[in-house]
Amino acid sequence: MPSITADEWLEAAAHRRSVHGLAGTSKVSDERVQELVSNVLSFAPSSYNTQPVRISLAFGEKHKELWSIILEKVEPVLKSINPALWKKLGPFLQNHKAAYGSILFWERGQTTKEAAETHKATSHMFSEWGDHAQGIHQILVWTALELEGVGANLQHMNAIPPVEAAIKKFAGVPEDYKLKAHLNYGDEQAAHPEKPKKLPIAETLTIL
């Protein structure tokens, strides 16, 4: 049995917040981050144990290089929509570049395709189940990093197609990989964010 209680585990999960304005340093070593991510990959569940999740790590200068590529692709897209949009979001994205590291979460498309072909009765569900697996991996890695003492925030730069293609090229992943999320991390430079207000439990929990 684990050495922590359910309440302790939930307290750890509740500590996780979206932390912005991160420093370009990390009190957690690259080796420790790799160890934490490897641990999550070794046990996090997926439907039928299909294991569609893949993760790439970028530390230090590689993180900066990655974000330089992202900014290069994002700027013309946002300016074409509205120059004011880039003026507003550009500094926010630069803050992500200023962090220390990146954790990229991918879905291996071939895994999802093979699972759908093997389990035809539920073939239409594997994309959704893959998203469930992604969420589990992301929250576990994110919480583990914050327990180690660094802050993190989850981004979805794949919302802009040219950006995802550029990130895939930079990471050298196979063509069937789909970027699902991008976790930035680094030392916190301000007070840890408070938990936001939630709806009353009476509105979100039903006893049948």
Whereabouts are the PLM-identified features?
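N-terminal amphipathic, basic helical "cap/leader" segment at the start of enzyme domains
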Residues: 1-101, 204-208
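Small-aliphatic-rich amphipathic alpha-helix that forms the alpha element of a beta-alpha
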Residues: 40-41, 109, 119-167
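Active-site-flanking beta-strand signature of metal-NTP-handling nucleotidyl enzymes
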Residues: 101-106, 183
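A structural motif
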Residues: 104-116
